[in-house]
A protein has these predicted regions:
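Surface/interface-facing alpha-helical segments and adjacent flexible terminal/loop regions used
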Residues: 1-9, 17-128
Length: 128
């Protein structure tokens, strides 16, 4: 992770590849802690500012995918001014504020779904 491009490649591998290859299973989220660790390192080194604007979000998605409100807040701060990213970030953050987790992950992670979460999911609740 010596370069912005190296960080980008690593974070796509850790964050996006599992989400697309192991959809619906716990494996989809297995590398999230590593992705978040490396995203923190990349941002600390301002690597997210060194990639093309269209690619920047791939360096930041581990914050948006985290179930910790602090990471959600950090994502929102990092994408401030980008209306499209702010829109999606708000959907993620609002879900964490409301439930403390992403209910659409419950089945894959073997978590019990609360009645409020089930109602949210039944109404088409955010599943990003």
């Amino acid at each position: 992770m010596d370069t912005a491009e190296g960080a980008l490649a690593l974070l796509i591998l850790l964050d996006q590849y599992p989400r697309n290859s192991f959809r619906g299973t716990a494996h989809q989220f297995a590398t999230d802690p590593l992705a978040l660790m490396f995203a923190n390192q990349a941002v600390a080194r301002d690597l997210h500012l060194a990639v093309e604007p269209e690619l920047k979000n791939f360096l930041l998605l581990p914050f948006e995918h985290s179930e910790r409100i602090e990471d959600q807040d950090r994502y929102m701060a990092l994408v401030a001014g980008d209306e499209e990213l702010e829109k999606w970030g708000k959907l993620h953050r609002d879900t964490i504020v409301r439930f403390g987790r992403f209910p659409h992950r419950n089945a894959a992670l073997g978590r019990q779904t609360t009645p409020e979460e089930q109602a949210f999911l039944d109404e088409g609740g955010f599943g990003g």
